[in-house]
């Protein structure tokens, strides 16, 4: 019998943006309920939903223009999913307290070949991506209370 404990490391369907239309609304809408964050390699588009308290969903996209090989796109998506999964409990708690929902789109914004470490092997690349993804998610967690206060007009 195996003691496989994958459950804590899942990225459940309830945390994912599934529909293409939801991505379109998230990326193309600009109003007081949306905001953007960028880091060296990644960007976030986020939209607040005051009518759906506590809802948190992530969408992850990596275009062929920035990562030509599917192996590389999968690596970047895995890195972003892991960063999102680790911050999800903190974000969900904050959203629950504030009584709003949030959709977050994460994407690679620079070509993979421009990232330092690409020529030093996959481990150096993973480290660069992981560090930047973690710092971006921490920046989101830090900025979110300010954004929520603006929505309420405080």
Label each PLM-derived region with a short phrase.
Residues 1-154:
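Positively charged, solvent-exposed patches that mediate nucleic-acid binding
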């Amino acid at each position: 019998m195996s003691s496989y404990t994958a459950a804590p490391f899942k990225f459940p369907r309830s945390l994912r943006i599934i529909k293409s239309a939801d991505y379109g609304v998230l990326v193309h809408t600009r109003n007081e309920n949306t905001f953007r964050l960028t880091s060296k390699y990644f960007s976030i588009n986020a939209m607040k939903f005051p009518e759906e308290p506590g809802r948190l969903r992530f969408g992850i996209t990596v275009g062929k223009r920035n990562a030509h090989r599917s192996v590389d796109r999968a690596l970047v998506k895995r890195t972003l999913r892991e960063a999102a999964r680790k911050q999800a409990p903190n974000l969900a708690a904050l959203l629950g307290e504030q009584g709003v929902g949030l959709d977050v789109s994460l994407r690679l914004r620079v070509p993979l070949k421009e990232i330092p470490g690409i020529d030093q092997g996959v481990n150096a690349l993973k480290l660069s991506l992981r560090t930047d993804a973690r710092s971006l998610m921490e920046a989101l967690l830090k900025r979110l209370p300010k954004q929520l206060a603006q929505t309420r007009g405080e």
